[in-house]
Amino acid sequence: FIKNFYMQVQQLPISKFLKTANSLIVPVYQRDYAWKRLNCDKLWSDIQQLISNKRSSHFLGTIVTINDGYGKYLVIDGQQRLTTITIFLLALSHYLRDKENPTEEEIQLQKVFKGYLIDEESISQETRIKLKPNKSDLEYFEKLFDEKKEIIENNSNIVNNYLFFKEEFKKNEISARKIFEDGLQKLHIVSIDLSRGQDDPQLIFESLNSTGVDLTAGDLIRNYILMDLEPQEQEKKYKKYWVEIERLTSDVAEFIRNYLIFKTRSWVKKDDVYLFFKKFAIDTYDNNKELILEDLLKYATIYGSFIQTQKHRNEKISSCLSRI
């Protein structure tokens, strides 16, 4: 399908990708950072194999972006990998920083790593850190860059994976230069940079998203509704509708399956929810995203009463619902 698009495709080391980008923004509709210690352990094992020359390179996956100009990119696909590599580099930099007697080379390496993580030319503190995760992850992510704050283990994947990498660097005692030059720089990606208004990010996302942590039907539907909107509209509709839909329904995919069954009077299998929803949205609402979200929120409120995420305003009805 590539010939039908205006995309720019290139294979390159992920370190080069990070170096040349000034700003990488994860849109609000993207799910939270989901990589666990197991995923990071596998990545670290791959890097160690590269260091020991058992492999000459390792393909990390595809990263899809929309270039908004001036080195600013919206991350459409690949945010899990990008976030993990950023955490890896930051942990490596802090491992060197915390050494009692760092060598001159190690001090210089810290500055090198900083160039992959920080946009030194940015005059705004908000845009100084190159990668900007979605709002759910942002607080924990920014804390890692705060030299004054102690990083302790908690329920954040971002923090815990940072601590995992840092501990591995201490245990293995491989030189930071070797980790970077013989390991990280051999991690390759395929970068797909889309042209806004010309390429269809949703179609490309669906075609490529087959690796990493599986997306639920709820994730895919959220992306489908919000992805092709302008960033400001994405954030507005996400806050106004989607956050409420998630809060009211607990399991968005299951809610939408029941919503579709009710609206179409047809049985919908769990594996078919996403494709069924897309057809329904086009046939019923001519793909008008505002109307779709309004209707979803209306039924999410009713659904929430049934599953008791929201009490019904009539106490007798609420009491009856709780006994179903």
Where are the model-predicted features located?
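Extended charged low-complexity segments that act as oligomerization/scaffolding linkers
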Residues: 105-144
